[in-house]
From Swiss-Prot:
Enzyme Commission number(s) from the entry: 4.2.1.70
Catalytic residue positions: 34, 168
Protein's name according to its UniProt entry: Pseudouridine-5'-phosphate glycosidase
Cofactor binding, note field: Binds 1 Mn(2+) ion per subunit.
Family label: Belongs to the pseudouridine-5'-phosphate glycosidase family.
SUBUNIT field: Homotrimer.
Functional description taken from the UniProt entry: Catalyzes the reversible cleavage of pseudouridine 5'-phosphate (PsiMP) to ribose 5-phosphate and uracil. Functions biologically in the cleavage direction, as part of a pseudouridine degradation pathway.
Organism: Deinococcus radiodurans (strain ATCC 13939 / DSM 20539 / JCM 16871 / CCUG 27074 / LMG 4051 / NBRC 15346 / NCIMB 9279 / VKM B-1422 / R1)
Top-level taxonomy: Bacteria, Thermotogati, Deinococcota, Deinococci, Deinococcales
Length: 313
């Protein structure tokens, strides 16, 4: 069996922002935040405004924010204002998942982290709760393409709770839930019996598991990891009613975007950015507004879960 890297070896790659390092050493709640949504999910300056706003929401709900990225080959856990600006404006920043981490770090590159790579870096830093917009999953047509997000594998092996608005609605939600079940990953919806579909509160799929409060979610995390059950938890937090786009309307836009993508012959990691961008066009910008609203909503929930988890000791 391969031995785990020592703390000294990990420290040689990690840069913890002082506020984050202090919070972790004192057992205070910290919430990890991803960076792909900043560099590849929204235009400038909306991306910077959103990122700063989300960090403030985490603070307002009792936790310390730790936006994660790779800059100059360093695993950054918490970003300065200048680093956030670089991430939001530098076109050389690549979207990186776990497979890309060793190359980006070894070659001193810049990378915006996906859900999977953010989870991995958060775990290395000792952060247990992570807020994002939507989680990746099984793509539609995966029976032909085998396009399945690394997010699902990371959820199966990394001890981090991911708070999201469910899996992205451009994906095959039913098959994604099946894969999570096979991998032993609890897919839990906060305060609802139906699993959400990112832009929409309803997906048509019953939630495998449900909790009613952040405190209940925190207790689930503690028990899971106390029992030695390796792997993460997907905590689905439905988008606020005031910001949602009904599932029926979204399905029309998604079908059109998928057809346009097929005509262009896009595949691999180009698919999700294209589809999300095309849906922004098809919805006249409404989907971007919904995306921002759900990210903010998830940040608040994640901070509350992290605060409750820290109280459990």
């Amino acid at each position: 069996m391969t031995s785990k890297p020592s703390n000294d070896r990990l420290h040689s790659y990690l840069d913890l922002q002082p506020e984050v390092a202090a919070a972790l050493s004192q057992g205070r709640p910290v919430v990890a935040l991803e960076s792909t949504i900043i560099s590849h999910g929204m235009p400038y300056p909306q991306n910077v405004e959103m990122a700063r706003g989300v960090e403030q929401i985490v603070r307002d709900n009792g936790a310390v924010p730790a936006t994660i990225a790779v800059l100059g080959g360093r695993l950054k856990v918490g970003l300065s204002a200048d680093e956030l600006e670089l991430l939001a404006t530098d076109k050389a920043v690549q979207k990186i998942s776990t497979r890309d981490l060793p190359v980006t770090v070894a070659l001193g590159g810049h990378g915006a982290t996906t859900v999977a790579s953010t989870m991995r870096i958060a775990a290395l830093a000792g952060i247990r709760v992570f807020a994002t917009g939507g989680t990746g999953g099984v793509h539609r047509g995966a029976g032909e393409t085998m396009d399945i997000s690394a997010d699902l594998l990371e959820l199966a092996r990394t001890d981090v709770c991911v708070v999201s608005a469910g899996v992205k609605s451009i994906l095959d939600i039913g098959l994604t839930l099946e894969v999570l079940e096979t991998q032993g990953v609890p897919a839990i919806t906060l305060g609802a019996d139906e699993f959400p579909a990112f832009y929409s509160r309803r997906s048509g799929f019953s939630s495998p598991l449900t909790v009613q409060t952040p405190a209940e979610a925190a207790r689930v995390l503690k028990v899971k990891w106390d029992l030695g059950l390796t792997g993460g938890v997907l905590l689905a937090n439905p988008v606020p009613e005031t910001a949602e786009i009904p599932a029926e309307e979204m399905e029309t836009h998604i079908t059109r975007a998928l057809a346009d993508m097929a005509a262009l012959g896009l595949s691999g990691k180009d698919t999700t950015p294209y589809l999300l961008g095309r849906i922004v066009e098809l919805t006249g910008g409404r989907s971007l507004e919904t995306n921002i609203a759900l990210v903010r909503h998830n940040a608040a929930a994640a901070a509350q879960v992290a605060a409750e988890y820290a109280r459990l000791g």
